[in-house]
Amino acid sequence: MAGTTGERPFSDIITSVRYWVIHSITIPALFIAGWLFVSTGLAYDVFGTPRPNEYYSQVRQELPIISDRLEGKQQINEFLKEVK
């Protein structure tokens, strides 16, 4: 016969009023905090990703695609010269 770990059964936890009082506040708060984190642009600053209007410069409006694998380094260097 299996022993007990002494922990409360999951069904007891999710049917308790205390669980729902705590989670009815924390779950919406986490959602709102995440939404604000992204909508204010702080996520772009924290993770260092470019904002949607910063992906391409005014000079270069296309993707820098490497077309020849043997001359890839040369193509990358040409792309970097254009960016500067």
UniProtKB/Swiss-Prot annotation:
Entry's transmembrane regions: 21-35
Cofactor(s), by name: heme b
Keyword match Transmembrane helix: yes
Chief localization: membrane
Subcellular location: Cellular thylakoid membrane
Any single GO CC term annotated in Swiss-Prot or TrEMBL for this entry: plasma membrane-derived thylakoid membrane
Membrane topology: Single-pass membrane protein
Pfam family, any one: Cytochrom_B559
Biological processes per GO annotation: photosynthetic electron transport chain
Biological function: This b-type cytochrome is tightly associated with the reaction center of photosystem II (PSII). PSII is a light-driven water:plastoquinone oxidoreductase that uses light energy to abstract electrons from H(2)O, generating O(2) and a proton gradient subsequently used for ATP formation. It consists of a core antenna complex that captures photons, and an electron transfer chain that converts photonic excitation into a charge separation.
Sequence similarity: Belongs to the PsbE/PsbF family.
The name this protein goes by in its record: Cytochrome b559 subunit alpha
UniProt source species: Cyanothece sp. (strain PCC 7425 / ATCC 29141)
Gene: psbE
